[in-house]
Curated annotation (Swiss-Prot):
Subunit annotation: The cytochrome bc1 complex contains 11 subunits: 3 respiratory subunits (MT-CYB, CYC1 and UQCRFS1), 2 core proteins (UQCRC1 and UQCRC2) and 6 low-molecular weight proteins (UQCRH/QCR6, UQCRB/QCR7, UQCRQ/QCR8, UQCR10/QCR9, UQCR11/QCR10 and a cleavage product of UQCRFS1). This cytochrome bc1 complex then forms a dimer.
Gene from which the chain derives: MT-CYB
Gene source species: Pronolagus saundersiae
Name recorded for this polypeptide: Cytochrome b
Transmembrane segments: 33-53, 77-98, 113-133, 178-198, 226-246, 288-308, 320-340, 347-367
Key word Transport present: yes
Length: 379
């Protein structure tokens, strides 16, 4: 008798995606981050659902409702801290996933790559709106500063900001709509993930060597299901370690003070995973220029496939490109550090230098290094 997973219309889809899927035999741990992101998304939706049952999106009660969740709701504190810290894990996995795509040339699957960029933007928007919900000092001022950036758009900027705010400042209307969007966006992300996987399974997965692996495939189960399970275990262990021992390590102390529109914090900054983009924004003295640089710092990923000049797909055998890639990683770490520092000398200069280097590496140096490598190999 034929196995039900191969005949049942629904189980057949699961079977072709998770069990009998032909996968390259040599994919490394860098390919684990996709499944880890899926795990993060599912767990974020679950914890978020339980938090939404007790949260109230009103400026008068939002802060106290979060306090109520932590103090009075059964296991509310752990649900809240898991939700907050898993967003950090989400972005760590996300950046590693994108980094792996750049290093091993996965961006040559343009459909999958472009849906991935759309996913990145959507996840960033969701995380930003989630950061506003506890209605602490940094939540309020972060929302004010970041939404205000849209006022740099010529002609329609001011109207656009007031339309998003639902008034003349960040207030009750803003909080209510941010909560509504924060609730609905993860489900839109889930739909986009399905499309992302659909495009990926059209081409099959890339592998570290960048060479087509059609002649050497193995079934996804049990080989990669076990490998993913180990990744899940490590991620959950790290998350529990963070949420149970140092739950506020990645948060901002200002968020323990209720939002006060009359008192500005000395240093307004977003969550740590947005600091690299925030540093690029601040490094340009002009408001519109800064906003364009901020958007381009992420949107630049969309033109990476067009800048691929190498005859090889992966960086595995390209030492020059490897060196530049790791300089890019170090540059992003520097930008993240600068984004968390006050706007004063020498941080301004370091931020400007790191921002220029970021764009120079991606737009000029990396394509140039690929051409030099082609020349060395006489290709």
């Amino acid at each position: 008798m034929t196995n039900i997973r191969k005949t049942h219309p629904l189980l057949k889809i699961v079977n072709h995606s998770l069990i009998d899927l032909p996968a390259p035999s040599n994919i490394s741990a860098w390919w684990n981050f996709g499944s880890l992101l899926g795990l993060c998304l599912i767990l974020q939706i679950l914890t978020g659902l339980f938090l939404a049952m007790h949260y109230t999106s009103d400026t008068m009660t939002a802060f106290s409702s979060v306090t109520h969740i932590c103090r009075d709701v059964n296991h509310g504190w752990i649900i809240r801290y898991l939700h907050a810290n898993r967003s950090s894990m989400f972005f760590i996995c996300l950046y590693m996933h994108v980094g792996r795509g750049i290093y091993y040339g996965s961006y040559t699957y343009t459909e999958t790559w472009n849906i991935g960029i759309l996913l990145l933007f959507t996840v960033m928007a969701t995380a930003f709106m989630g950061y506003v919900l506890p209605w602490g000092q940094m939540s309020f001022w972060g929302a004010t500063v970041i939404t205000n950036l849209l006022s740099a758009i010529p002609y329609i900027g001011t109207n656009l900001v007031e339309w998003i705010w639902g008034g003349f400042s960040v207030d009750k209307a803003t909080l209510t709509r941010f909560f509504a969007f924060h609730f609905i966006l993860p489900f839109i992300i889930t739909a986009l993930v399905m499309v992302h996987l659909l495009f990926l399974h059209e081409t099959g997965s890339n592998n570290p060597s960048g060479i087509p692996s059609n002649s050497d495939k193995i079934p996804f189960h049990p080989y990669y299901t076990i490998k993913d399970a180990l990744g899940f275990l490590m991620l959950i262990s790290l998350l529990l370690l963070l949420a149970l021992f140092t739950p506020d390590l990645l948060g901002d102390p200002d968020n323990y003070s209720p939002a006060n529109p009359l008192n500005t914090p000395p240093h307004i900054k977003p969550e740590w995973y947005f600091l690299f983009a925030y540093a690029i924004l601040r490094s340009i003295p002009n408001k519109l220029g800064g906003v364009l640089a901020l958007v381009m710092s992420i949107l630049i990923l969309a033109i990476i496939p067009l800048l691929h000049t190498s005859k090889q797909r992966s960086m595995m055998f390209r030492p020059l490109s490897q060196a530049l890639f790791w300089i890019l990683v170090a540059d992003l770490v520097t930008l993240t550090w600068i984004g968390g520092q006050p706007v004063e000398h020498p941080f301004i200069t370091i931020g400007q230098a790191a921002s220029v280097l970021y764009f120079t590496l991606i737009l000029i140096l990396m394509p140039l290094a690929s051409l030099i490598e082609n020349k060395i190999l006489k290709w």
